[in-house]
Every structure is written in structure tokens, then in C-alpha cells.
């Protein structure tokens, strides 16, 4: 599974500005989803890879980013 890293309180994606390989996204994805995951910056949001099937990613139901 893959998807955008999301803040569970706000419903917002984690923003990033250095597209492609991005240490911030890699670190945040690993912290949120575990060591096996990876991440990079895609369309100014952290995109996480190698997630477990039940991982919660953006968009969250009934939560809009404010």
C-alpha cells in the first residue's frame, strides 16, 4: 500500500518542498508506519511506500484539512 502521510488530528497531508528524495518524508513515514516503509516528496506532500494494508493515509473520512 502507498499513500500520503496524514495528520490524524487535522486531516492535512504532511507538506514538503524538496521534491523527490526527501529525508524529512522518509523519516516521518518510518516514524508513523515502521522501519519497512519509505517515503519521498510528491506534489508537495509526503508520499509513503511499503505500508501495511490497514495503514491510515490521506484523505481521512469526515476530516477536511483546515
Curated annotation (Swiss-Prot):
Expressed by the venom gland. It is found in: Secreted. GO terms for molecular function: sodium channel inhibitor activity; toxin activity. GO terms for cellular component: extracellular region. Disulfide bonds join 12-65, 16-41, 25-46, 29-48. It holds the Pfam family Toxin_3. This is Toxin Css8.
